[in-house]
UniProtKB/Swiss-Prot annotation:
SUPFAM superfamilies: DnaK suppressor protein DksA, alpha-hairpin domain, Glucocorticoid receptor-like (DNA-binding domain). The lineage of its organism: Bacteria, Pseudomonadati, Pseudomonadota, Gammaproteobacteria, Enterobacterales. PROSITE patterns: ZF_DKSA_1, ZF_DKSA_2. This is RNA polymerase-binding transcription factor DksA. The keyword Flavoprotein does not apply. It comes from Buchnera aphidicola subsp. Schizaphis graminum (strain Sg).
Length: 151
């Protein structure tokens, strides 16, 4: 079920589910105009709705599969499966929160710019990860710093 959920919640798959094509920017088009904002709003709302459906599906799945196995190994396997499902559900819940924050940025007309350096994040990066809040350069630097702190 985990592979099925990851397949469904990919932001690029959400683009297809929303019935949208990758945004075709015109040469003289202003960055993050109304048309672009609407494009990303549709992507984010579709993604949020898909995640909500999957969260509800997880709850029903656990309720349906909940059996009291007499064998301790079977019980342990079931508990491990439920633990993974609940972890996925928690991850989805956190992603929904991030999507809601991003939708607020769109509403406030503050979407598409790096939180660190205020540079345009870029249409293609945002289509790949609509909740991105750092440009690729700042994200790369943040990941390098994170690796240095960990290792």
């Amino acid at each position: 079920m985990e592979k099925e959920q990851n397949k469904k919640t990919s932001s690029l798959n959400v683009l297809a589910i929303a019935g949208l094509q990758p945004y075709q920017k015109k040469t003289d088009e202003e960055y993050m105009n109304e048309k672009q904002m609407l494009h990303f709003k549709k992507i984010l709302e579709t993604w949020k709705n898909q995640l909500t459906i999957e969260i509800n599906h997880t709850l029903l799945y656990i309720q349906d599969k909940s059996t009291n196995f007499p064998d301790p190994i079977d019980r342990a396997a079931q508990e491990e499966e439920f633990s993974l499902e609940l972890r996925n559900r928690d991850r989805s819940r956190k992603l929904i929160k991030k999507i809601q924050e991003t939708l607020k940025k769109i509403k406030d007309k503050d979407f598409g710019y790096c939180n660190s350096c205020a540079v345009e994040i870029g249409i293609r990066r945002l289509e790949a990860r609509p909740t991105a809040n750092l440009c690729i350069d700042c994200k790369t630097l943040a990941e390098i710093r994170e690796k240095q702190m960990a290792g």
